UniProtKB/Swiss-Prot annotation:
Disulfide bonds join C37-C85, C60-C81. Its main location: secreted. The keyword Mitochondrion does not apply. GO terms for biological process: envenomation resulting in negative regulation of voltage-gated potassium channel activity in another organism. Keywords: Disulfide bond, Protease inhibitor, Secreted, Serine protease inhibitor, Signal. It comes from Cyriopagopus hainanus (Chinese bird spider). The record marks L47, R48 as: Reactive bond for chymotrypsin. It comes from the Eukaryota. Residues 1-27 form the signal peptide. The record marks L39 as: May bind Kv1. Residues 28-33 form a propeptide. This is Kunitz-type U15-theraphotoxin-Hhn1h. Expressed by the venom gland.
Length: 88
């Protein structure tokens, strides 16, 4: 039973890495800096409820943030999101 649980955890971790790692790489500039506007939305790890905004590649979209974790593609207002991420 312990081996099956371990293998299941390894498989889950592998899938999460395969999904997350390419998204992080595509958000990286050539000089190694991360463009926060290209990161996926990150709801965070807690169960609190904060309405925030993230840039989805074209526009700013509202999402629920849990209050801890996530990433820097998170803004308190649509205006702040557009100011940082919208291209003129």
């Amino acid at each position: 039973m312990g081996t099956a649980r371990f293998l299941r955890a390894v498989l889950l971790l592998s899938v999460l890495l395969m999904v997350t790692f390419p998204a992080l790489l595509s958000a990286e500039h050539h000089d190694g800096r991360v463009d926060i506007c290209r990161l996926p939305s990150g709801s965070g790890d807690c169960l609190r409820f904060f309405e925030m905004w993230y840039f989805d590649g074209t526009t700013c979209t509202k999402f629920v943030y849990g209050g801890y974790g996530g990433n820097d593609n998170r803004f308190p207002t649509e205006k702040a999101c557009m100011k940082r991420c919208a291209k003129a």
